[in-house]
Amino acid sequence: MNPIISAASVIAAGLAVGLASIGPGIGQGTAAGQAVEGIARQPEAEDKIRGTLLLSLAFMEALTIYGLVVALALLFANPFV
């Protein structure tokens, strides 16, 4: 295997995981903060807010998992070789 392609694949895998986790991390923090604020304002709506929060957190976490899948594909099933 060409060492330049191997090095570029490792760097790309690291960037894929790193960049794929920045957006969802910020989004999850914002969503959790807004959920806590909403529950503090309307405690009677806690169940509905918590359910919506957990569903949206799962969708945001899926984006990070996609980045991990791309990184694993670059590391173990390198299409550039």
UniProtKB/Swiss-Prot annotation:
PANTHER family reported in the protein's UniProt record: ATP SYNTHASE LIPID-BINDING PROTEIN, MITOCHONDRIAL, ATPASE PROTEIN 9
Membrane topology, record value: Multi-pass membrane protein
Any Pfam family hit: ATP-synt_C
Any single GO CC term annotated in Swiss-Prot or TrEMBL for this entry: proton-transporting ATP synthase complex
Residue stretches in coiled coil: none
UniProt keyword Transmembrane helix, yes or no: yes
Membrane-spanning parts: 3-23, 57-77
Site positions per UniProt: Reversibly protonated during proton transport: E61
Subcellular location: Plastid, Chloroplast thylakoid membrane
Cysteine-cysteine disulfides: none
Entry's Gene Ontology molecular function annotations: lipid binding; proton-transporting ATP synthase activity, rotational mechanism
Oligomeric form and interacting partners: F-type ATPases have 2 components, F(1) - the catalytic core - and F(0) - the membrane proton channel. F(1) has five subunits: alpha(3), beta(3), gamma(1), delta(1), epsilon(1). F(0) has four main subunits: a(1), b(1), b'(1) and c(10-14). The alpha and beta chains form an alternating ring which encloses part of the gamma chain. F(1) is attached to F(0) by a central stalk formed by the gamma and epsilon chains, while a peripheral stalk is formed by the delta, b and b' chains.
Organism: Cicer arietinum
Name of the encoding gene: atpH
Name under which the protein is recorded: ATP synthase subunit c, chloroplastic
Entry's family note: Belongs to the ATPase C chain family.
SUPFAM superfamilies associated with the record: F1F0 ATP synthase subunit C
Subcellular location, principal: plastid
